[in-house]
A protein has these predicted regions:
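Short glycine-rich anion-binding loops that position phosphate/pyrophosphate groups of nucleotides
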Residues: 68-69, 185, 239, 290
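Short helix/loop capping segments that flank catalytic or ligand/cofactor-binding pockets
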Residues: 73, 189-191, 244
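Glycine-rich, charged/polar anion/phosphate-binding loops
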Residues: 49-50, 141-143, 164-168, 217-220, ...
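Glycine-rich phosphate/pyrophosphate-binding loop regions near the starts of catalytic domains
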Residues: 10-21, 31, 37-181
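Short, low-complexity, intrinsically disordered N-terminal modules
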Residues: 27-28
Length: 336
């Protein structure tokens, strides 16, 4: 079972290169100085006080996102190793920050854990979480713990920033803009389908990174914002068909996409996974001008254009049909 709460927090703090309150100010000072040296957001006070105290970069606005992950809905322990669960929990928030062109700064983790959960599982969760956090210079600044009467529950709040007035919103698309996506779509959903069918048992996360260890497009999002290339942007977490509709609704526009242009992992035969699968954590964005074929080492593909009105259509084999939002829906659809 997990350690008692105080000991658990101390263990998490040590994993995050900080110290529990019992270690005194010296450990916390070392932590703060280390992050000052590496240029991470100005953490003035982290784990050990009632609130974290952070200083935003001068002239920046705060970006705040929260994501809730529930066992048997967003992950299953029999399928997902704890390192993958921790990684994926943070990746969801990082992808939101990427979609606004921001820089991630600090994370807060609230965990509810069942009494019978091995401490080794908790250690693995934070190994995955903190490994991804380190990659993007994100500091674990606080959180909460509780006992769960059922499965594992993880709530992640992520703080980021962008120069004031520059964050890329969903509402900036205009008729005539081109539609682009980064990377490939549908690989994560294909792995999930194999897990559900039983064809894939105890897979290696390193062999199927799109599903188990996705990497959010932080650098690409930053460049799209900084160079003013994107007029509107959203991350693809619920599926292209659904997230495209979210963007169009916020902008008050429609869209036309071309099936043969969608970069579906596995080719045209896997198009349905690319359109409706979700968990891609790629970026969907609109642009008024031409965009490079690659940004920050990630491929960029033009898949269509923004149109007047509110209709969203797919052109396939020369035929145009309305594209329904067939991706993830929290109420009324089966768990992932």
């Amino acid at each position: 079972m997990p350690l008692p709460e105080k000991a658990l927090i101390a263990r998490i703090a040590r994993q995050a290169w900080t110290a529990a309150p019992a270690a005194g100010a010296r450990g916390r000072d070392t932590y703060q100085k280390a992050h000052t040296r590496t240029g991470v957001a100005g953490l003035r006070r982290g784990i050990g006080d009632d609130c974290a105290v952070l200083q935003l970069p001068s002239g920046h606005a705060a970006l705040v996102t929260t994501d809730f992950s529930l066992e048997e809905v967003h992950f299953r322990r029999r399928w997902h190793p704890p390192e993958s669960v921790g990684h994926r929990c943070l990746a969801r928030g990082l992808s939101d920050i990427a979609a606004m062109g921001g820089k991630p700064l600090a994370a807060f983790v609230s965990l509810a854990l069942p009494a019978g959960l091995p401490q080794e599982w908790v250690d693995g969760f934070f190994k995955g979480f903190l490994g991804l956090a380190k990659r993007f210079s994100v500091v674990l600044a606080g959180g909460d713990t509780s006992q769960s009467p059922g499965g594992v529950l993880a709530d992640i709040i992520l703080l980021g920033s962008a120069p004031a007035g520059t964050a890329v919103l969903r509402s900036g698309a205009r008729a005539g803009d081109s539609l682009y996506v980064t990377g490939e779509l549908g690989a994560a959903a294909q792995v999930l389908a194999q897990l559900r069918s039983g064809r894939l048992k105890r897979p290696s996360p390193r062999r199927y990174p799109a599903h188990f260890l996705p990497i959010p497009r932080i650098a690409a999002g930053h460049i799209l914002r900084a160079r003013r290339l994107a007029s509107a942007m959203i991350d693809i977490s619920d599926g292209l068909s659904t997230d495209l509709r979210h963007l169009c609704e916020e902008s008050g526009v429609g869209a036309r996409i071309y099936a043969e242009k969608v970069p579906a992992a596995g080719g045209a035969a896997k198009l349905r996974f690319a359109l409706h699968g979700g968990d891609d954590y790629e970026l969907l964005f609109t642009a008024k001008g031409k965009v490079p074929d690659s940004i920050a080492g990630v491929s960029v593909t033009r898949i269509g254009e923004v149109t007047r009105g509110r209709k969203i259509v797919l052109v396939e084999d020369g035929q145009e049909r309305e594209l329904p939002a067939g991706g993830w829906e929290h109420f009324g659809r089966r768990p992932r």
